[in-house]
A protein has these predicted regions:
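A short acidic, glycine-rich active-site loop
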Residues: 57-65, 195-202, 257
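ATP-binding pocket architecture of kinase catalytic cores
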Residues: 1-119, 123-136, 150-154, 276
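Regulatory N- and C-terminal appendages and interdomain linkers associated
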Residues: 237, 241-276
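Hydrophobic residue at the +6 position relative to the catalytic HRD Asp in the kinase catalytic loop
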Residues: 146-148
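Active-site activation/catalytic loop segments of kinase-like enzymes and analogous catalytic loops
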Residues: 172-217, 231-249
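Catalytic-loop of the protein kinase fold
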Residues: 136-138, 143
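All-alpha amphipathic helical-bundle segments outside canonical DNA-binding/catalytic cores
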Residues: 89-90, 220-231
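Activation of the activation-loop gatekeeper triad in protein kinase-fold domains
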Residues: 159-165
Length: 276
């Protein structure tokens, strides 16, 4: 929360989709926990299901897809020193630290030996991009972390959940978004796992989205499939962390009983992206 306040209280002056954060208080005695006072934005969140006004409207769906890419591109074009965030994070070595960190989390998550995951991790290390670009990175950018206009859902009102924002490789955000960007010709399990309705008629394809992002930012996107594969690996680790807590009896929620199948889906996805 403190990090989010720091980011938004500065970024909001230079990036219209960042709601302002007016106050952060870490004194537990006031309301019983730390709290934050933020600007209110009015809009709605789109998750797996499209709003009623988008049904059978591929033209609207395309505009929603383009809006997601445009908003991300606009964020990545913000100069950190223009908004007082030049000292946020450590962009040097960002990709290597991310790969090391998520590999360690996988090993710590109690997973049984998994040949496919070992192959995917080895490929990620062998092909880690050497070119490092630097921008403000949201780190959890997807459609349901946005507010869109109530009557014009192709118009963004705000981007939410900035608690993991840092400085690093901008393609990490794009790869993360692509991992949730299903399209009609994807395997059924990929579509089922997606948190976004992009497999519906009209949404741009992943390739079109990459091209639009590259045109708008000028960033080198030659290594985007590495970041896409890494995002799939990262999701596998996150779900494995939840699954192992269930196996160990640390949570009783029976929804987690089949999460091993979801882990396998993301590992397979990462391997396919990497052509393994």
């Amino acid at each position: 929360m403190a990090r989010e306040h720091r980011v938004l209280s500065r970024l909001s002056a230079g990036f219209p989709l960042a709601p302002n954060s007016f106050l952060f208080c870490d004194d537990d005695e006031i309301i019983g926990a730390p709290f934050q006072v933020m600007e209110r934005r009015h809009g709605k969140v789109i998750r797996r299901e499209l709003p009623e006004e988008c049904n059978a409207r591929p033209d609207i769906n395309r505009r929603i897809g383009e809006m997601m890419i445009d908003a991300l591109a606009d964020l990545h074009m913000i100069r950190r020193d223009d908004v007082g965030l030049e000292d946020l994070g450590h962009p040097e070595g960002f990709t290597q630290r991310q790969l090391d960190g998520w590999t360690k989390r996988w090993k710590d998550a109690g997973a049984a030996d998994n040949t496919d995951m070992e192959r995917l991790i080895a490929w990620l290390y062998q092909h880690r991009p050497t070119l490092e670009q630097s921008a403000l990175v949201h780190n959890d950018y997807k459609l349901d972390n946005m507010l869109v206009d109530n009557s014009e859902p192709w118009r963004a009102v705000a981007i939410l959940d900035w608690d993991m924002c840092t400085s690093g490789e901008p393609l990490a955000d794009l790869g993360y978004l692509l991992n949730q960007w299903a399209q009609p010709d994807d395997p059924p399990l990929w579509i089922e796992e997606s948190t976004m309705p992009t497999a519906q008629s009209g949404f741009p394809s992943r390739t079109e989205s990459i091209e639009r992002y590259a045109t708008q930012t000028g960033y080198d996107c030659d290594t985007i499939h590495w970041h896409y594969a890494f995002a799939a690996m990262r999701f596998a680790v996150i779900i494995q962390q939840i699954y192992i807590r269930y196996v160990r009896g640390q949570t009783q929620d029976d929804r987690f009983a089949t999460f091993d199948t979801r882990v396998a889906t993301y590992i397979d996805k990462g391997c396919r992206i990497a052509s393994l």
